[in-house]
């Protein structure tokens, strides 16, 4: 998913679409936040 690439940025993922990118945000978030 190209959205996943955007997820790497962080906030951009949520702004673009928190629902479809939530999975990516969660995976990337765990690495960044945890």
UniProtKB/Swiss-Prot annotation:
Covalent cross-link 2-cysteinyl-L-phenylalanine (Cys-Phe), where: 13-22
Alphabetic keyword roster: Antibiotic, Antimicrobial, Bacteriocin, D-amino acid, Secreted, Thioether bond
Protein's name in the database: Subtilosin-A
Pfam families for this protein: Subtilosin_A
2-cysteinyl-D-allo-threonine (Cys-Thr) crosslink, residue number(s): 7-28
Superkingdom per UniProt: Bacteria
Task of the protein: Has bactericidal activity against some Gram-positive bacteria.
InterPro entries: Subtilosin_A
Broad class of where this protein is predominantly found: secreted
Residues in the signal sequence: none
Single Gene Ontology BP annotation: defense response to bacterium
Organism, as annotated: Cytobacillus firmus (Bacillus firmus)
Chain residue numbers at which the record places covalent cross-link Cyclopeptide (Asn-Gly): 1-34
Modification after translation: Alpha-amino of Asn-1 is covalently linked with the carboxyl of Gly-34 to form a cyclopeptide. Thioether cross-links are formed between cysteines and the alpha-carbons of other amino acids, Cys-7 to Thr-28 and Cys-13 to Phe-22. In forming this cross-link, Thr-28 is converted to D-amino acid.
Keyword Zinc: no
Location relative to the cell: Secreted
């Amino acid at each position: 998913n190209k959205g996943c690439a955007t997820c790497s940025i962080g906030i951009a993922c949520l702004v673009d679409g928190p629902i479809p990118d939530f999975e990516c945000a969660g995976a990337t978030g765990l690495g960044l936040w945890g």
